[in-house]
Amino acid sequence: MKKGFRGTGTVERVDFPNKGIAVTDDGDRVIVKNTIPGQKVEFVVNKVKHQRAEGRLMEVIEKSPLETEEPCPHFGMCGGCTYQTVPYEKQLDMKLTQVKKLISDAIGTEKESGYEFIGIHGSPKKSEYRNKMEFSFGDEYKDGPLALGMHKRGSFYDLVTVSDCQIVDEDFRTILKATLDYFSKNNIPYFHRATHKGYLRHLLVRKATKTGEIIVDLVTTTQTEGFNEEELLAGFRYALLTRHYDGIFKGVLHTKNDSVADVVKNEGTEVLYGDSYFYEELLGLKFKITPFSFFQTNSLGAEVLYETAREFILGDDKDSLNGKTVYDLYSGTGTIAQLMAPVCKEVVGVEIVEEAVCAAKENAALNGLDNCKFIAGDVLKVLDEIEEKPDYIILDPPRDGIHPKAIGKIIEYGVENMVYISCKPTSLARDLQIFMGRGYRVEKICCVDMFPNTYHVETIVLIQKRNS
């Protein structure tokens, strides 16, 4: 099969991440993304490497027997959701199967390696579950009207105005519509990624699930030719605050970003209304969140994730960490560190993002926790500098997993138990191979679905020292 070949096939399975395996009438297998098991699809081969062909999806010729009617009018055009036409229980089955395959390919099956795979916990909410969205300004086609939403599937430039997005609640949709209407009427140009000209870049919206508090951050360039920015922003603030919301508006902000890269970047933020932060609650703790704070985007799902992790850590003995020191490596804003603090002597969190460390310290103080210590720095370097030795280690690394040298240092501590929380099962499978080759074994595994209708999945693993 050569590059440029156009063919059809039936998708027999989908591997992580979002890689459909389509089988042609001749028995050839082609990887086609954004597909669902059982679909008959047309594809064009765009890559052939080591006798392995990858194709771009051109058309779904026949729907899968698994599929139902899509609840979102943007599905198929928007690049946000992939499994929205699949019933939720089947989505969970697909994700569980994908993770099980990756783990068993890496370290053996449950029977071969002796671990227990508990299954998968679903999200408490299947729709309207997100507490944060980053919308982009642009157009839906070249020289078309202003758009505000998500990138079209497979497109770097074109957008879909997701005014009826189903993974956020009505307040998000109201804010999007109010913003788009206002700037469209004022003929304000968006920042063009090719010419690097224009004003409007992104709209960042956050809403706490538990408290209902909302903040909005408009991200623009400093290119203000042709209009009075102060008057424009005052009008924007008015356009937002005069709409009806179920939640409580806590702040409207304006962030400047002249970076060429198409990412939300903070080069200076001003408050147009209210505060620059809001509060969310998680498992009885309170967290102060700014527009750029890292915080799990599904608050109710995060409670399931962290409660499951806490059960893995403590087991049947709720006093097992009394008088002990816990390392929380890649600790982010210190959520899990603060959840463990009441049951241990001390928690030491290590995180490379300095702003996240500042937030962790502030939130620990907010929750009255004086036995949390947070250190800003690379885990690989900080482990050489910490004097306290851990009795237990919690690992919650970024998507790429743990640096091999850092794994070596972690193993040298020789702790009896560790819990690994992973947001990318391919990285997890690779890292588990290293742990198992260095005197540890996998005791049990559980998946948690934090992102319904997408291919993303979280996995929690209890790792134990052999003969412990």
Each model region followed by its residue ranges:
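Short, solvent-exposed loop/turn elements at beta->coil junctions and helix N-caps
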Residues: 118-126, 193, 200-202, 447-450
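Terminal RNA-binding accessory module
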Residues: 1-74, 111, 153, 373, ...
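Internal alpha/beta scaffold segment
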Residues: 157-201, 222-254
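Structural signature of eukaryotic scaffold interfaces centered on beta-propeller domains
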Residues: 206-208
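Rossmann-like S-adenosyl-L-methionine
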Residues: 1-7, 13-17, 222-468
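Short, acidic/hydrophobic/Gly-rich beta-strand patch recurrent on exposed beta strands
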Residues: 20-25, 149-152, 217-219, 360
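Short, conserved phosphate/pyrophosphate- and ester-handling motifs at nucleotide-, phospho-/glycolipid
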Residues: 38, 168, 298
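Extended interfacial segments that mediate partner engagement and assembly in macromolecular machines
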Residues: 59-70, 79-190, 210
